[in-house]
Amino acid sequence: MKTMALMKKTAMPLLLALLAGTAQAEVHLSEVFGEHMVLQRDRPLNVWGRATPGQTLTVELAGRQARVRVGADGRWRAQLAALPAGGPHRLRVSGDQVVELDDVLIGDVWLLGGQSNMEFTLANTDTGPQEVASPQNSQLRQLRVPLRASVRPEAEIAPAPWVVAEPGRVGDFSAIGYHFARQMQAVQGVPIGLIDAAWGGSMLETWVRRDVALQDPDLAPAVRALPSDVEALTAALRQRVHDRVAAWQPGLPLEGVDASRWSAAADIDNDWPTLQAPQLWEDQGLAELDGVVWLRKRVQLSAAQAAGAAELQLAKVDDCDEVWVNGRRVGGQCGYDKSRHYSLPAGLLRAGANWIAVRVTDTGGGGGIYGDAAALRLDTAAGAVSLAGAWRARVEKVDVSSQPSANAAPTLAHNGLIAPLHGLSVRGVLWYQGETNAGRAAAYADGFKRLIQDWRGQFGDPDMPFLFVQLASYLPLASNQPGSGGWAELRASQAAALALPHTGMATAIDVGDADDIHPRNKRTLGQRLAALALHELGLRAAPASGPRLLAHEARGSEFRLRFGATAGGLRTARAGEPLRGFYLAGADHRWVPAEARFEGDAVVLRSAAVTAPVAARYAWVDNPSEANIVGGDGLPLAPLRTDDWPLESAGRRYQP
């Protein structure tokens, strides 16, 4: 809490006069500063805020002092000489009023960016219960930047506290940030401050600055079209979504509809369009739609299948569902990451036609039935009946929040969360994002590099470490298509950023979950990011990025990959298992699985189906969890390819 004390005056009239003029004689620190905060060590410290124009302010911290005059616009900014790690200290700003912040530490500050896997809280991880109950770590603090989309760069973040890592509160910390910080502290022994600015479901394009977006011909039109305020943006978004829904379900009104019979056991939906399930509706023509959508399916059952009780498996639903079978409500729940299972009593199903109706409410981000197709089924006494495929669907209601989502347009998240941090010194950035961009993966490579370079400019450090997580394994193994897939291509675009200096990539293909886009193991990723940071800072000699491809060549019917930076040689993740995850292609560009063997620091590939291989790939599928090559230190080999053939996503660009 910012505490404010008026300067003592010896004469009561002067004190009363001062009190009367308090509204005109204010001193404020920026909202990014607060008690329990951590400021960056060994760097000049910028402190800023607002005050009555013309005042002279004195800023003091741990023996450092600066004087500054408030500008005509009421803003002030002071710079203090660098401080070593330590504290707690008191920050004091004095003018016509005094503002003091206690329990200020000096250490390393790391900015956390990206989407929900970076946002994912410690309490929800596989080790959450133990971590949340651990003793207080007074040297670790977090500032969770409130989510706010803005059409113009904001001067302030929305008010939010710095929080000490203590039981009862640490569960809300970014799990990756927490495990990263613990590992860094074990080596460095200094305070760590985390600034969590991640936003679940956010696209890359929302995190770029306006000037950068204007340089991209795909983004520039949307940025130029941004209205002057959030209210106008919300109105435009509402109209855009309504127009999209009207085009998707032509002839079916949206306003004032009576949905009371949409759960009926009858063919009431013959004029409804269809959605594929399991699959989010944003990928099927209903982008940006939050609200209520009904999905209905007519299922034919035999007498044997209809006999007795049954179990309805609905994979997962984002976010809430209500379910009817043959007109009877059988259940409902909320939680985008929860599997849906509903028991159907004997007598509810019938031989012949049966109707399943699901009313889905999406409160933000993706919406619909999603997950593994095998988990969308009806388990009957006579076996399972698949429910995957086309469902009749109709939009009942569109909800447009008064606060637009991060993805309503490019630059919005940057304006609301990153722009207000301008001037703050940070040690580096941790980034986990890309799932939302998998549909236009090829374009991500250039956009990601532009973002890294621009953020370095904004924080005044051209060498600022930028460490990121490569997408984890996800989606059913059965859906893998060798040599293709949006997630596979997005990983390649992420890896392209390693061409920039002072970047590092933590591979996550071995810690994913086929059924959950949010793998619960965040400790491994935090520790891998810490290893990258320690190597970047010169505190770890060995590379922290797994084996690295040095050379490749075709030799007759075989293809040879030679590796370096293996930190103890190549091996499989578990001793004795065959090498998996490699693919070969000939001049026809057809990818087939390859047999593989180790030869020293090389892997030699062959396939009876490819007599003259010209290219190889490894872990190049959406879910490469079966790929099993690691270095001697256990760090996985990242997905790779030796070809430069066009990606499937080439040409797919951002569209409003």
Please identify what each model-predicted range represents.
Residues 48, 272, 299-327, 356-358:
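Aromatic-lined ligand-binding clefts that engage carbohydrates, nucleic acids, or primary amines
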